[in-house]
């Protein structure tokens, strides 16, 4: 059984794409969430056998899930990018852009996975994790 977001049976990069690109067919589909906690829990419990997760999900690195290689580029790259309201950009201007650029330059997939693990697997407060990371990177006061 494959688990994924409710729109997966119609999305070209989900079930139809897996069938067309890799010849994969699943007996059933479970509508869950978009690679979030419901999907992860269903995989870990054995309720589903396959799903799409984000590469920054720490459960993949925990050793009990197998990450498959998408050597035919079915899945698009989904990079983390800052998005601002125009009013926010106008209010804070170049200083905010410079700060966001500095964070983006240091926030690799490996770093984001490690940060996610601290929150999702170790139960740490997201603000504290982000603040520590910012301080460790020499970026400002480390407050979030």
List the model feature ranges, each with a label.
Residues 1-36, 40, 124-128:
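Bilobed "Venus flytrap"/periplasmic-binding protein-like clamshell domains
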């Amino acid at each position: 059984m494959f688990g994924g977001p409710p729109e997966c049976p119609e999305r070209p990069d989900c079930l139809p794409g897996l069938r067309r690109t890799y010849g994969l067919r699943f007996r059933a589909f479970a509508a869950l969430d978009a690679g979030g906690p419901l999907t992860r829990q269903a995989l870990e419990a054995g309720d589903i056998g396959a799903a799409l997760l984000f590469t920054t999900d720490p459960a993949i690195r925990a050793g009990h899930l197998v990450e498959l290689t998408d050597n035919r580029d079915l899945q698009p790259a989904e990079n983390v990018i800052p998005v601002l309201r125009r009013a926010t950009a106008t209010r804070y201007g170049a200083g905010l852009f410079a700060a966001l650029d500095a964070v983006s330059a240091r926030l690799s997939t490996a770093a984001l996975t490690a940060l996610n693990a601290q929150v999702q697997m170790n139960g740490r407060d997201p603000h504290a994790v982000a603040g520590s990371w910012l301080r460790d990177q020499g970026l400002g006061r480390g407050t979030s």
